[in-house]
Amino acid sequence: MTRYLCTALALSAGLLLTGGTASGQAPATKLISPVRGEAELGYLKPVSKREGNMIVTTIKVKNLAAGPIAGLKVDEFWYDKAGEPVTGAQPFRYRKALMPGEVIEVVLRVPTNPKMDRNQYKFEHSNGAIKTKLLPKM
């Protein structure tokens, strides 16, 4: 009799626990297709600082497109006074989709070179090009 009672109690406790976790789960997320072709991206003026023998550039970026941007990639290129390429940064890659209105911080590191005069940034994503817009504030 006690064995039957213990089995019944254990079974009912197990059902209560599993029933509570099933109802407490978050609703399924809806997948949104990423932007194809040209996407719009806003950014603040880049801030460059020298750290040892590296120049570290930080850029705040905001997705202004209607959909998420998949595979965001940012490159930085440095040129000398004659316009010849001197060096460049390792590309920054954002592995997740950049959702509409989301703000992230891009950090680019470049080794210093005495010939460096000016730089240029290239923004692109896995499904096309990016049209950038300098924002006064975020």
What are the roles of these predicted feature ranges?
Residues 25-58, 64, 137:
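Low-complexity, acidic Ser/Thr/Pro/Gly-rich terminal tails and inter-domain linkers that flank the onset
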Residues 68-71, 86:
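Short acidic/proline- and small/hydrophobic-mixed sequence motifs that coincide with surface turns
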Residues 78-88:
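Short aromatic-acidic-glycine turn motif
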Residues 86-116:
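Intrinsically disordered, low-complexity Pro/Gly/Ser/Thr-rich segments with frequent PxxP/GP/PP motifs
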Residues 8-18:
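Bacterial N-terminal signal peptides
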Residues 26-28, 110-138:
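Terminal connector regions
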Residues 63-68, 82:
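Short, acidic/polar linear motifs in exposed loop/turn regions
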Residues 1-9:
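Bacterial N-terminal signal peptides that target proteins for export
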